[in-house]
Amino acid sequence: MKKHSHITGFYVETLMMIVVFLLIILLLTQVFGLAQMQSTKAKRLNGAVVLAQNAAEAVAASETAEDLLALLNENDNAFPMTDTAGVTACYDSELNPDAGGTYRLDVTWLPEKTENGTMVHSMAEVRCDDAEAPVYRLETERFRMEVGT
């Protein structure tokens, strides 16, 4: 009888150990799943920041909205915005110009004449996978002094 209780104890301990290992495996699976999700979000945000910074530099280098379109257009990935002055450009997941890409960059171009020159207000919004809310938004302004004033 004593041998039987030792074997039963062994089975109970083994069963408890298996349950503990299964719980640990489930917990680690959830942790790694959440880490993968956070990594994907971080990659999207990083890509959006790069695209918005590039757009801000293009705004600074442009005299007109047409110049901005010429700077952002590669492989026919950019086109003028229909509802306001500005440019929409599309990029793939590796940030290469692609008309059907996952990233959409909308850059507004709102010039305002002042007594000394022109102030251009611009907003670069990056959306991913046709989402309504932008992943990243960057406001920028540039001033061009009029020659002879």
Question: What does each model-found stretch correspond to?
Answer:
Residues 1-5:
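Positively charged n-region of N-terminal signal peptides that target proteins for export
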